[in-house]
């Protein structure tokens, strides 16, 4: 896929500066990335990142997806609805490591239209999560379903109660006890 010439320079700069991310007080920081894009509008940042996601998916480049997700976070764009379809597509791709981040972003949205996707992510059998006996991804998905708080979300949590894994059942039950599931199932 050809990068649109409009965003080619910005994407290269974004990827280069993303490599300079560091940790202070257990928080990821990248002041240089933020300052280099300070004159770029949020809409332009969204368009640049969306273009980058398309290209990274085509190349199956996990590092680029990670850098793009970091950029979304640094620019505080994670709750922008323009990314919902990208998050849905990325949640189904195994080549990257950002599934837990995506589950957390879904949790922020509280959108009934993401329920099926969140459930599919919770039951996905991606190889990289098969070692995780704490089921961190599943727990984040359960929280996202709980925060959506609709009858359909409750149904998906009840399906997770049927898991052979006790920890998954516990995560689902935690949300079933926490929520009242009275929000409307409007997609």
Predicted regions and their residues:
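Amphipathic alpha-helical scaffolding segments comprising HEAT/armadillo-like alpha-solenoid repeats
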Residues: 2-12, 42-56, 78-93, 111-127, ...
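Short inter-helical turns and helix N-cap capping residues of alpha-solenoid HEAT/ARM repeat scaffolds
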Residues: 61, 94-95, 126, 134, ...
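Charged, low-complexity interaction regions
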Residues: 22-24, 60
């Amino acid at each position: 896929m050809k990068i649109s010439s409009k965003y080619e320079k910005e994407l290269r700069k974004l990827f280069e500066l993303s490599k300079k991310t560091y940790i202070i007080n257990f928080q990821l920081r990248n002041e240089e990335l933020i300052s280099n894009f300070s004159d770029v509008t949020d809409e332009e940042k969204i368009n640049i990142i969306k273009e980058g996601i398309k290209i990274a998916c085509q190349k199956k480049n996990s590092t680029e997806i990670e850098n793009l997700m970091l950029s979304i976070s640094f620019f505080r764009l994670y709750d922008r609805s323009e990314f919902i379809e990208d998050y849905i597509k990325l949640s189904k791709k195994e080549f990257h490591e950002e599934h837990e981040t995506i589950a957390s972003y879904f949790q922020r949205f509280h959108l009934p239209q993401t329920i099926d996707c969140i459930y599919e992510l919770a039951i996905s059998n991606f190889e990289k999560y098969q070692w995780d006996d704490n089921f961190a991804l599943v727990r984040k998905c359960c929280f996202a379903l709980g925060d959506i708080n609709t009858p359909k979300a409750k149904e998906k949590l009840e399906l997770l109660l049927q898991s052979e894994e006790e920890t998954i059942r516990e995560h689902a039950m935690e949300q079933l006890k926490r929520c009242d599931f009275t929000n409307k199932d409007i997609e």
